[in-house]
């Protein structure tokens, strides 16, 4: 029996921390409809992602994908930097 290919989970978010070596913290925001009131509410999640070359900085918009656990709290890896933060 042929083994089915797994779909890779990818998310897009903003880098909120790059202080760790080869690790970034990405803020993922999503809109969820409230079950009773019907209003759309912002919900957010912070994920640690592996950044092998330390190329990301705070404010960058990035795409990350799920991977095997690399540390206690790190199981995502950087795929692409979509938009660089504006340097002041």
From Swiss-Prot:
Q: Which GO terms describe its biological process?
A: translation
Matching Pfam families: Ribosomal_S17 (PF00366)
- Transmembrane feature ranges: none
Among InterPro entries, the record links this protein to:
NA-bd_OB-fold, Ribosomal_uS17, Ribosomal_uS17_bact/chlr
Arranged from A to Z, the UniProt key words for this protein are:
Ribonucleoprotein, Ribosomal protein, RNA-binding, rRNA-binding
Purpose: One of the primary rRNA binding proteins, it binds specifically to the 5'-end of 16S ribosomal RNA.
Tell me the protein's name: Small ribosomal subunit protein uS17
Source organism: Pseudomonas fluorescens (strain SBW25)
The primary gene name is rpsQ
């Amino acid at each position: 029996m042929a083994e089915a290919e797994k779909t890779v989970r990818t998310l897009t978010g903003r880098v909120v921390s790059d202080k760790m070596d080869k690790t970034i913290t990405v803020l993922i925001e999503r809109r969820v409809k409230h079950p009773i009131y019907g209003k759309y509410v912002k919900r957010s999640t912070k994920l640690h992602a592996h950044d092998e070359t330390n190329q990301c900085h705070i404010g960058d918009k990035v795409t990350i994908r799920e991977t095997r656990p690399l540390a206690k709290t790190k199981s995502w890896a950087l795929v692409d930097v979509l938009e660089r933060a504006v340097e002041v």
